Curated annotation (Swiss-Prot):
Signal peptide residue numbers: 1-25
Biased segments, Polar residues type: 269-279
Subunit structure: Interacts with virB8, virB10, virB11 and the 15 kDa protein that is encoded within the VirB locus.
This protein's UniProt keywords: Periplasm, Signal, Transport, Virulence
Region listing for Disordered, in residue ranges: 267-289
InterPro entries noted in UniProt: Conjugal_tfr_TrbG/VirB9/CagX (IPR010258), VirB9 (IPR014148), VirB9/CagX/TrbG_C (IPR033645), VirB9/CagX/TrbG_C_sf (IPR038161)
GO cellular component: periplasmic space
Protein name: Type IV secretion system protein virB9
Organism placement in taxonomy: Bacteria, Pseudomonadati, Pseudomonadota, Alphaproteobacteria, Hyphomicrobiales
Compartments reported by the entry: Periplasm
Entry's family note: Belongs to the TrbG/VirB9 family.
Amino acid sequence: MMRFSKIIFLAFLFAISCLTVPLFAETAPVSARKDNRIRFVNYDPYNVTQIIGSIRSSVQLEFADDEEVTYVGIGNSVAWQVAPAGHFVFLKPREVQPVTNLQIVTSRQDGTKRSYQFELQVREGDVSAGNDTYFLVKFRYPEDEALRKKLAKAAEAAQREENFVNDVFNIHENFGPRNWAYEAQGSSLIEPASVYDNGKTTTFTFLGNTEIPAIYLVSLDGQESLVPKSIKGNKVIVHAIAAQFTLRRGNDVLCIFNKRFVPEGINPETGTTSPSVQRRVNIGNGHEG
């Protein structure tokens, strides 16, 4: 009975020792497919990365492109030579000595920092492929890559939505409600073939290779001003509506009058010039979308 109790007690002590004694192990970088001297490792600030250098060869550490090495600390500067350069660090073992450590801190463009821990080992012998030696250790950043993909996906979705909205506006520009009630007075040499508006923009159409005149918006007090416009083929789309426009080319002058001018434009009850695109007000952040 006493012997059985002793066995149970020893087993209990062993179990407790397994729970209370932590296990330490460095991370060995993964070999590249074509050459085992090229290595890759995922960044983890709480991992120690193993580096094996060989006499008469150097090891290159490569961090993210947006990082710059700002601090390097090494346990044995006699056995190892360290040379930081931008987001790289070059290591050269000088002599075979016991294992030591290397600590590197980098600064990123967004102001944050990253910390790296290394265990350095030196070996002698052949440095050709197939031997246990490192030439390049490149860090990978899965979280950064996942974030880049997420942002790229969101940007693509936003672009698709913008393209869809533009397509809808173009449809209603071409096929939506129009005001054709315009009259012209002045030189027929610069008279457009047609003029209409959709409540937001005014479109002037010219024939053939006609030299397009300057188009001025005339305010209610008679002042003329140039306004933004787009040219699509033989059409000039002025990004405004007005009671009067004045066209000028050299000595030729033509006045265009909007006989059905409505200052607020066409209202399709959506807050835009398209009945298919609605304007949304976000109360929470005080912005309109």
